[in-house]
């Protein structure tokens, strides 16, 4: 593998000195870019794009051609794992992801098998190795998965949900069934992420998009417990370097201390968290990633630059901060505004790394 030319993202996650604060954007390969839309049209639909390793590589690299980003993230979807379990993933126009066969009974859960990442998910591994080769050491490659709880919400609900009624009913009326599902998902995610590292991923991220829907105690029981199991099972060294792991629970500001105890290297913060407060609470243990409101990219460029300065000042001096949005970039954002955001992070952060 080519030697890494820009490792500031990995260094910041491990709280090693950097020259400027590294920056990347969740969903940086996405619909706000005209070149992404053209490639997606070429693929036919979203999952065809994910399953074609050459096109998945192309869209992963597109934002790096435009912007001075400090990391690339694998272009894929969190629902690849349940899809590989045979649930029949499809996308309904305007409805988002759906499953033909929801996992909403204990019998359905018992029948689930753990997918082989090199077989049923081989297309993801091919994408990882292709992207790593094509990056040629320019920046690190981030691999990722959804958290067991978040994957389970889609599997039990049969798709997206605003109320999470079915999975919460299972959690409280049939907790053993849900624990069986979460356990299988944790085992699947461990294999999946370790295979991504074996194929070239240099950092890992676990997206717990719906952990914030849980009560204070239920979060620990049904989400954090299984992310802990994953972290305990991950490959943490490859190519002679540590493979940093970032946990991100959207709406997880209540639980930063508990998340920091898992042994992860960094916590992702959504835009509702004050980064200065987060650093006071857990900055001695973990790095922090975040956390500008993605909607701020609709603001005039001087306002974006002002907000970048505010967040950098909130974190303060020294390493341990990876700048990002608090969630994925919106599809109608002007690419110029995204570019101004990235430039502002690098330009304004030098003063914090003397």
Swiss-Prot record:
Enzyme class, UniProt record, top EC level: lyase
Cell location: Cytoplasm
GO cellular component, one term: cytosol
GO annotation terms (biological process): protoporphyrinogen IX biosynthetic process from glutamate
Molecular function, one GO term: uroporphyrinogen decarboxylase activity
Family as reported in the entry's similarity comment: Belongs to the uroporphyrinogen decarboxylase family.
Superkingdom of the organism of origin: Bacteria
Biological pathway: Porphyrin-containing compound metabolism; protoporphyrin-IX biosynthesis; coproporphyrinogen-III from 5-aminolevulinate: step 4/4
Keywords, alphabetical: Cytoplasm, Decarboxylase, Lyase, Porphyrin biosynthesis
Coiled-coil annotated residue ranges, if any: none
Annotated binding of substrate, by residue: 27-31, 77, 154, 209, 327
NCBIfam families: hemE (TIGR01464)
Classification via PROSITE patterns: UROD_1, UROD_2
Function: Catalyzes the decarboxylation of four acetate groups of uroporphyrinogen-III to yield coproporphyrinogen-III.
ATP-binding in keyword set: no
Organism: Shewanella baltica (strain OS155 / ATCC BAA-1091)
Known partners and oligomeric status: Homodimer.
Pfam families named in the record: URO-D
Catalyses which reaction(s): uroporphyrinogen III + 4 H(+) = coproporphyrinogen III + 4 CO2
Main location: cytoplasm
Membrane spanning stretches: none
Annotated protein name in UniProt: Uroporphyrinogen decarboxylase
Site (Transition state stabilizer): 77
EC code(s) of this entry: 4.1.1.37
């Amino acid at each position: 593998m080519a030697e890494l030319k820009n490792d500031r993202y990995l260094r910041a996650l491990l709280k090693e000195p950097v020259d400027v604060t590294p920056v990347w954007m969740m969903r940086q390969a996405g619909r706000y870019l005209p070149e992404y839309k053209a490639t997606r049209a070429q693929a036919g639909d979203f999952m065809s794009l994910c399953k074609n390793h050459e096109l998945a590589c192309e869209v992963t690299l597109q934002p790096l051609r435009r912007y001075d980003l400090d990391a690339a993230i694998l272009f894929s979807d969190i629902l690849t794992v349940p899809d590989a379990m045979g649930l029949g993933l499809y996308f309904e126009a305007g409805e988002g992801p759906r499953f033909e066969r929801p996992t909403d009974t204990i019998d359905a859960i018992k029948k689930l098998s753990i997918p082989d990442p090199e077989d049923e998910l081989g297309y993801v591994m091919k994408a990882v190795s292709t992207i790593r080769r094509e990056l040629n050491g320019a920046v690190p490659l981030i691999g990722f998965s959804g958290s067991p709880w978040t994957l389970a919400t889609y599997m039990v609900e049969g798709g997206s949900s605003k109320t999470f009624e079915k999975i919460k009913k299972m959690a409280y009326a049939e907790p053993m069934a849900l624990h069986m599902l979460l356990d299988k998902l944790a085992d699947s995610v461990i294999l999946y992420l370790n295979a991504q590292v074996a194929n070239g991923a240099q950092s890992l991220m676990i997206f717990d998009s719906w952990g914030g829907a849980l009560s204070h105690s239920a979060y620990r029981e049904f989400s954090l417990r299984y992310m802990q199991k994953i972290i305990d099972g991950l490959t943490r060294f490859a190519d002679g370097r540590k493979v940093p792991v970032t946990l991100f629970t959207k709406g997880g500001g209540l639980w930063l201390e508990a998340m920091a105890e898992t042994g992860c290297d960094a916590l992702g913060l959504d835009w509702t968290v004050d980064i200065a407060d987060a650093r006071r609470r857990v900055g001695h243990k973990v790095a922090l990633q975040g956390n500008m409101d993605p909607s701020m990219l609709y603001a005039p460029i001087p306002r974006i630059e002002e907000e970048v300065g505010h967040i950098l000042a909130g974190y303060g001096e020294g390493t341990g901060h990876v700048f990002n949005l608090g969630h994925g970039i919106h599809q109608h954002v002007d690419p110029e505004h995204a570019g101004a955001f990235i430039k502002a992070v690098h330009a304004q952060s030098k003063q914090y790394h003397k």
